[in-house]
């Protein structure tokens, strides 16, 4: 059965679609940006803006699973996180989709201290109300070149560099998403929230050193994309965490899906 990945131009979404194609399944990509590489790899690309619920519903015809990544930690308009998932929920319900998997953040909820986690919490509520089986994956800091660039060029203070995170490799998260889809293949109802923390907690400074990003004042900025002031402000809000899940009610996604993540390191080349 087909799988559709929303906002397939986003780095993690694009990589999820590419990995699904490697498994030989029918993959649809919904986006308003260029994803020529996915089209060349065999994906059916439906071009449309994120708020076109009618076009998205049409693209979802006969789709089994929707994977919705949503906005990231440097999203400059947190309200869009909610509006996007509302469109996806409406289209998925109208099309009779059988399962939806969405990414979120540790600590997402209405009383979170930062606007992105509050928006993610509201998005989780929208997902939970969808009539088909749904899965929310609360992923810690996802190690990608984009995240490395943002953190390397953000001018982090010493206090911010000492914040502890539980970074998760992009490739491990992608494999978890695919595994969760398989594990829940027979489910006909229910909402599941799982944690996807990295296996090792470390400071942001230690994480950057581990993935080869030099300290401030070094050559850390050479060849890196500079974030906009708006993205830097959004990042400053979200960095305070939490960056892992301690709630015993929330399942450990790795254990549930029988996966074992590895810590990010110098050998990683996580695309995105």
Model-based region annotation:
Residues 30, 65, 71-72, 77-130, ...:
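Conserved Rossmann-fold NAD(P)-dependent oxidoreductase catalytic core, especially the SDR/UDP-sugar
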Residues 39, 43-64:
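Conserved Rossmann-fold cofactor-binding substructure of NAD(P)-dependent oxidoreductases
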Residues 5-6, 68, 99-102, 135-138, ...:
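Structural signature of the Rossmann-like NAD(P)-dependent dehydrogenase/reductase core
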Residues 14, 50-53, 82, 86:
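Structural motif corresponding to alpha-helix initiation and N-cap regions
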Residues 29-34, 49-50:
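N-terminal Rossmann-fold cofactor-binding loop
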Residues 2, 174-272:
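Mid/C-terminal beta-alpha module of Rossmann-like enzyme folds, strongest
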Residues 2-25:
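N-terminal Rossmann NAD(P)H-binding glycine-rich loop of SDR-like oxidoreductase domains
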Residues 133-134, 140-165, 172:
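NAD(P)-dependent short-chain dehydrogenase/reductase
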């Amino acid at each position: 059965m087909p799988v559709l990945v929303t906002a397939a131009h986003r780095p993690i979404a694009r990589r999820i679609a590419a990995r699904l194609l490697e498994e030989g399944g029918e993959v649809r990509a919904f986006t308003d940006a260029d994803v020529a590489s996915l089209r060349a790899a065999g994906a059916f690309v439906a071009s449309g803006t994120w708020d076109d619920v009618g076009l998205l519903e049409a693209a979802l015809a006969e789709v089994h699973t929707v994977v919705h990544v949503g906005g990231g930690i440097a999203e400059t308009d947190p309200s869009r996180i909610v509006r996007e998932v509302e469109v996806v929920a409406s289209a998925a319900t109208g099309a009779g989709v059988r399962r939806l998997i969405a990414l979120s953040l540790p600590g997402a909820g209405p009383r979170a201290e930062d606007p992105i986690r509050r928006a993610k919490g509201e998005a989780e509520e929208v997902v939970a109300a969808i009539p088909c089986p749904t899965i929310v994956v609360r992923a810690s800091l996802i190690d990608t070149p984009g995240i490395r660039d943002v953190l390397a060029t953000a001018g982090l203070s010493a206090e911010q560099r000492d914040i502890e995170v539980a970074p998760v490799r992009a490739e491990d998260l992608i494999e978890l998403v695919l595994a969760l889809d398989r594990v829940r293949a027979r489910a006909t109802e229910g909402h599941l929230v799982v944690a996807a923390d990295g296996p090792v907690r470390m400071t942001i400074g230690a994480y950057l050193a581990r993935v080869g990003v030099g300290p401030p004042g070094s050559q850390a900025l050479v060849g890196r994309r500079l974030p906009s002031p708006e993205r830097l402000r959004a990042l400053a809000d979200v960095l305070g965490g939490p960056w892992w899940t301690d709630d015993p009610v929330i399942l450990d996604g790795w254990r549930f899906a029988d996966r074992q993540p590895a810590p990010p390191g110098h050998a990683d080349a996580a695309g995105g």
